[in-house]
Design a protein with these regions (language model features):
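Conserved N-terminal/central alpha/beta ligand/cofactor-binding core
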Residues: 29-156, 160-165, 172-173
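Beta1/beta-strand and adjacent pyrophosphate-binding region of the FAD-binding site
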Residues: 1-9, 25
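Aromatic pocket-lining residues of Rossmann-like dinucleotide-binding sites
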Residues: 17
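Short beta-strand segments that buttress and anchor functional surface loops
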Residues: 176-181
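Glycine-/small-residue-rich beta->alpha transition segments that form the dinucleotide
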Residues: 30, 182-183
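Core beta-strand elements of the Rossmann-like FAD/NAD(P) dinucleotide-binding domain
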Residues: 183-191
Length: 191
């Protein structure tokens, strides 16, 4: 599996593929010290949740005081709320089928990320129903942790490697990817 990019979505895909037994290469166009793109600057995640008890497994040592704080400042955020918010901010341009997939899998994705060792803290600075938690350590920690997990799972990361073009075979299936490297252009072939 070849993954283009090394932000949160890309690293999630890379780790998931490695967990499924695939050999994974991540192509990161940035040098190592700038890796991860905009993930470095993120802090919050929007996901549906039904109760404070849903949030507890995402927060290490979740205290009664933290639970009380969320109960007092936030209301549950349903899948319908999430769906409607995305449709509202996109002015109805989101693909309904893909959006339904996002909405239905957002909380399971959070649980999976927690199983990978990511953690959150209550977000009292921005206590909205849709984002009651913030990343523990922010985006920099999220990014660094993904790279640690990927290394443990055997994911190969190639820095200064920019994906340029997907290469289809005669049947239209993607059979490779053209990549710009410090040494010039190369092609990675897929199976």
């Amino acid at each position: 599996v070849v993954v283009a990019g090394a932000g949160n979505a890309a690293m999630s895909a890379a780790v998931s593929a490695a967990e499924a037994g695939a050999k994974v290469i991540v192509l990161e166009k940035a040098p190592e010290h700038l890796r991860g793109g905009n993930t470095y600057f993120t802090g919050d995640f929007r996901f549906p949740w039904a109760s404070v008890e849903d949030l507890a497994p995402l927060v290490p040592d979740f205290s009664d005081a933290e639970a009380k704080g969320i109960r007092e400042t936030c209301t549950p955020y349903s899948q319908t709320d999430f769906y409607d918010d995305v449709m509202r901010v996109t002015e109805g341009r989101s693909d309904p089928e893909l959006l339904e997939l996002l909405v239905s899998q957002a909380f399971p994705a959070m649980q999976w990320m927690a199983a990978m060792g990511h953690t959150w803290v209550p977000s009292y600075a921005n206590p909205t129903a849709s984002m009651p938690l913030a990343l523990n350590g922010g985006g920099a920690t999220l990014s660094d942790h993904w790279f640690d997990v990927a290394a443990r799972k055997g994911v190969e990361i190639l820095y200064d490697h920019q994906a340029i073009e997907l290469l289809p075979d005669s049947a239209g299936e993607i059979s490779g990817i053209r990549v710009q490297t410090p040494a010039g252009y190369t092609t990675f072939h897929t199976k």
